Amino acid sequence: MQSIEILDEPTYTFASSDNLRRYSFELDLSGGYRRSSVHGVVIDSQPVAVFGACGGATQPHSNSLLKHGDRYYLAVGSFVVCFSIGPFKHYWALAIDPATCFGVHCCSDSGALISHGELEISRFTESGNILWSTSGADIFSEGFALHAGFAEAIDFNGKVYRFGLSDGRVRA
């Protein structure tokens, strides 16, 4: 079984040989803007891929990386990137939130892939298409959980939202 580690690489410079680690795959998603998040993927202690993005800064944490089937989904800045390991293969990168993607989740009963963004909660497919995306009155900074049939997000003002997993509509 291969081990995978996600590293915060705030000082990494793309297309430079003057980095602490050398990654064989680089993807800069910043579009020419200043990168606020750079995450390295290390497999079995070997640096394999590095992803950089603009938007709100993110650091690796327990909900940054999701393994679903044979693919991994990684939150980097305002993006979700999809890849597999053994050998490494990059599939796609998806701008999932206008500001920041806080985490990537999978509902255990339905298999729905959900991103918890700062401004939006979104459901996306394994092929990188957004099925629905919805927002609230304020930023979703005070909590997030998946339940059978709905995603629950709490905004900055403490308002609780329950979004149906099938369509993203607010449930009572």
Q: Across the structure, where does each feature detected by a protein language model lie?
A:
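Short loop/turn segments that connect beta-strands within the blades of beta-propeller domains
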Residues: 68-69, 76-78, 108-109, 117-119, ...
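Acidic, small-residue rich beta-repeat scaffolds with periodic aromatic anchors
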Residues: 143-172
